[in-house]
């Protein structure tokens, strides 16, 4: 019973964080909706003012400000300022982490965010998988080019078919989040490929699907032991969310998976997640750590 309550409580925390990420991506929340609506209409000044007001606490606003500065929309274009905002939000906003991983240092005079498309296009057209992936990111985020999901999908597929793990992970997200449940099997297939190549994000998202059966087709039944194995791989690479979930697994024996409870390991994983995770992951890990130290009881909100 304790294990069930622990899992349910953790799921509530994860659901809240997932909802926040989903609403950030889909213009949810009154303030965010107003800012994103203004952005979509080309009213960049209004979007800027709204995002700036909440930027001290809102990572989604920080991401939005970075986009404005990168594209010079409503503000003076500044690659370095865009990068600064994305660095503030990178622990909570996946798009910020992805952009920071592909964009060159603003101090390099040979590159500006506005000209990256024309610099990467020839290599992408010639079949370079990394350039194809980078172009797809530009199109999917709308940095330096108009946001275009159709073009993003084309380049993600080209890179993914060349075993580019990050492109495979992004392509899986595209299938599930853009196309919905009908494409869940395709999403999982791409995540499986990325996971086999060592992509920690793919390992983590696959673990969640196998653990809870979210969107799984009959061809992909629930598999707790597979979920644990995937989280072990992702956690070993320092993935904070995987570390948090794996920690709660180690709080109790899992005989069906030949796993013996190890509260010391659980505590170590949670401490790593708290040190390295974003705001939502840190809160989740802190909640589980409290439960670990208080016989499964979670803190009162």
In which residue ranges do the predicted regions lie?
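Short helix-capping/linker turns of helical repeat alpha-solenoids
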Residues: 31, 38-39, 43, 56-58, ...
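Canonical positions in the second alpha-helix
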Residues: 51-54, 88-89, 121-123, 158-159, ...
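Hydrophobic face of amphipathic alpha-helices that form TPR/SEL1-like repeat modules
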Residues: 37-38, 53-54, 64-71, 99-106, ...
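Hydrophobic membrane-insertion alpha-helices, especially the h-region
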Residues: 8-19
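Ser/Thr/Pro/Gly-rich low-complexity linker/stalk segments immediately outside membranes or between
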Residues: 22-36
């Amino acid at each position: 019973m304790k294990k069930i309550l622990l899992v349910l409580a953790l799921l509530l925390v994860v659901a809240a964080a997932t909802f926040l990420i989903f609403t950030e991506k889909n213009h949810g929340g009154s303030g965010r909706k107003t800012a994103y609506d203004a952005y979509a209409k080309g009213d960049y000044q209004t979007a800027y003012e709204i995002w700036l007001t909440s930027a001290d606490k809102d990572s989604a606003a920080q991401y939005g400000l970075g986009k404005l500065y990168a594209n010079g929309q409503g503000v003076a274009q500044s690659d370095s300022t865009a990068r600064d905002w994305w660095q503030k939000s990178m622990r909570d906003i996946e798009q910020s982490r992805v952009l920071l991983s592909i964009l060159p240092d603003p101090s390099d005079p040979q590159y500006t965010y506005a000209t990256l498309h024309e610099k990467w296009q020839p290599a992408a057209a010639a079949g370079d998988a990394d350039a194809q992936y980078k172009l797809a990111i530009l199109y999917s985020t709308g940095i330096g080019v108009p946001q275009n999901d159709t073009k993003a999908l084309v380049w993600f597929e080209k890179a993914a078919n060349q075993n580019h793990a990050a492109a495979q992970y992004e392509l899986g997200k595209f299938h599930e989040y853009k196309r919905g449940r009908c494409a869940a099997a395709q999403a999982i297939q791409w995540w499986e490929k990325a996971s086999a190549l060592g992509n920690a994000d793919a390992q983590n998202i696959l673990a969640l699907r196998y653990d809870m059966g979210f969107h799984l087709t009959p061809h992909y039944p629930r598999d707790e032991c597979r979920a644990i194995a995937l989280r072990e791989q992702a956690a070993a690479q320092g993935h904070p969310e995987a570390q948090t979930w794996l920690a709660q697994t180690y709080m109790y024996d899992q005989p069906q998976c030949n796993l013996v409870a190890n509260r010391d390991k659980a505590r170590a994983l949670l401490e790593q997640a708290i040190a390295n995770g974003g705001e939502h992951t840190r809160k989740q890990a802190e909640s589980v750590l409290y439960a670990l130290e208080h016989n499964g009881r979670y803190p009162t909100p």
